[in-house]
Every structure is written in C-alpha cells, then in structure tokens.
C-alpha cells in the first residue's frame, strides 16, 4: 500500500456516524449477496466500523478482516485487524474472500500498484466473489472546500479519472453511485480540516490550513449541508 497515512477520516466524522454506516451497508448489500458464512476483507479499513456493523447485521460466523497501515487503539472489536501493506498481504494470503472492499483507498496507490492490487485481489476471491471499489465522484463532487483545497482536489480527481480508465482496461465492472446527505456543524468540519481528514490536505503547511480555515469560517453559516458522493465499481 502507498505510504500515505490518513489517520482521521473516520474519527468522529459523518463517515463514522451510525446513519452513514447503516446507509452505506444497505447500499453495499444491494451490490452483493452475503450471508453468515461470508468472508470479508476491507483494504484500508481505518477503525473498521463499516465491516464491524456488517458483521453484526449479518451475524457473521467469521470476523471480517480489516487491514490498514495505521493501528487505531479504538478499532472496532467486531473485526479482526491486521496492520499490513495490502500488496504484501494479498501476495502471501492463503484464504479466499467473498468480498474484498476497497473504499476510498485506491487513489493512494500508484498505477502500477493498482494493477497488482486488482490482479492479486482477483486471486484472493472465492468463486463468485466480488471486489467493490469506492472513490470520490469525479464529476459532481460537493465536498466543502477552501480555494487551495479546491485546486488540489480537482488535481486529485483528474488522477481518479485516469484510475477509472485503467480499471476499465483491466476488468469489466458495474458502476453505481452512493450519495449521503451530510449536515455538519461548521466548527466540527473546521476541526476535520485541521486534522487533515482527506489526503488532499496532507501536503499543506500549517499556514495554508490556517488560511483555509478562515475561508471556511466566512464562507459557510453555522451548519454546512452537502451530498457526499461516491462512485462504486463492482468487479
């Protein structure tokens, strides 16, 4: 996996809220049929709340496995966690999965790594198993941004488009969209930016972040409303 580490994307944000997780897993289960005996791998799982909820919902016999470069002390207890590089893990792994979930993680890999990742993932699937990839909507993104963040996000989304083209060449897939209505306190969103909740913010200096926070303060009222939009590819 790429060396980029995002520690706070699912730490007390809408992405870790019960409503988001419930809505996302409802969407997910329309893409794939799973049951109590299903085996699940989440690549870039963060704290593992999504697959933890899925484990409870399906009453899974086997704990779903989440891998990430960061070991969080507050990880979900309903999952089995492994701190690992995804490519190394998939190369050495002997078990097969019904679902390999790659949610908002694939952009952290190089194009060469993405090809390896998908080829290895295919080899790690049971017969009839699926890879489900989610990334930011490249066309209709509504994430609240300040000027520099918007520029960097546009650059990142251009690269995401190239990733989608690469995946198109590698494997056939079904494309869907997942949208979630977000209403968040401005102060809470400011804290998320301060904690660099998205990879676009990681290279920025503290002064650039501070300037961006001031822009957001003046740009939005006490609450910020938008749709968090993701593209979903089912391989």
Predicted features by range, described:
Residues 1-36, 49, 53, 132-158, 196:
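Conserved class I S-adenosyl-L-methionine
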Residues 41, 46-89:
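Class I SAM-dependent methyltransferase SAM/SAH-binding core
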Residues 101:
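A conserved beta-strand element that flanks and buttresses the S-adenosyl-L-methionine
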Residues 104-105:
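Short catalytic micro-motifs in class I SAM-dependent methyltransferases
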Residues 115-127:
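A short glycine-rich, Lys/Arg-flanked "PGG" loop and its adjoining helix->strand segment in the class I
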Residues 156-171:
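Short alpha-helix
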Residues 174-235:
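Conserved Class I S-adenosyl-L-methionine
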């Amino acid at each position: 996996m790429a060396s980029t580490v995002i520690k706070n994307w699912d730490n007390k944000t809408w992405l870790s809220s019960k409503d988001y997780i419930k809505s996302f897993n409802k969407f997910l289960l329309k893409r794939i049929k799973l049951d109590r005996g299903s085996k699940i791998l989440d690549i870039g799982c963060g704290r593992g709340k999504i697959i933890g909820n899925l484990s409870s919902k399906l009453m899974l016999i086997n704990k779903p496995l989440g891998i990430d470069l960061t070991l969080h002390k507050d990880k979900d207890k309903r999952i089995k966690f492994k701190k690992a590089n995804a490519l190394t893990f998939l190369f050495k792994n002997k078990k097969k999965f019904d679902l390999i979930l790659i949610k908002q993680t694939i952009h952290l890999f190089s194009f060469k790594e993405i090809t390896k990742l998908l080829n290895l993932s295919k080899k790690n699937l049971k017969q009839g198993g699926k890879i489900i990839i989610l990334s930011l909507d490249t066309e209709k993104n509504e994430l609240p941004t300040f000027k520099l963040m918007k520029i960097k996000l546009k650059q990142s989304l251009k690269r995401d488009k190239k990733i989608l083209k690469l995946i198109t060449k590698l494997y056939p897939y079904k494309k869907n969209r997942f949208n979630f209505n977000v209403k968040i306190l401005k102060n809470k969103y400011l804290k998320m930016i301060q904690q660099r909740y998205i990879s676009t913010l990681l290279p920025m200096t503290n002064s650039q972040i501070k300037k961006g926070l001031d822009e957001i303060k003046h740009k939005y009222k006490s609450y910020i409303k938008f749709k968090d939009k993701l593209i979903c590819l089912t391989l």
